[in-house]
């Protein structure tokens, strides 16, 4: 199976300089305030911080000096590997300065599928529970 949405970003030398100094589980802001960034390297032994629409730029791969791909963020959000995100990968603007919904945005704005399933099942259980079962 081909894994979709797993293209790495080509980082500028200045971005790589920032990424390289962040230890596992650490944040760039803990090292130097001069960068003015919230880059954080994920700790593979801890839960991920919340994935958001705009925060995708902040997640550094635990072992590689790069940001996470759309697919890696989607895995954190519990999307199945066969799920494909469409549209542009990164922010792009139309001539009217309207931001299009990016693949990163789709992942960050989504309710994690396993969470949605758990909530739906809880509602279903409550909704279809027979009143006589409660007595």
Could you say what each language-model-derived stretch is?
Residues 1-135:
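C-terminal target-recognition/interaction regions appended to catalytic cores
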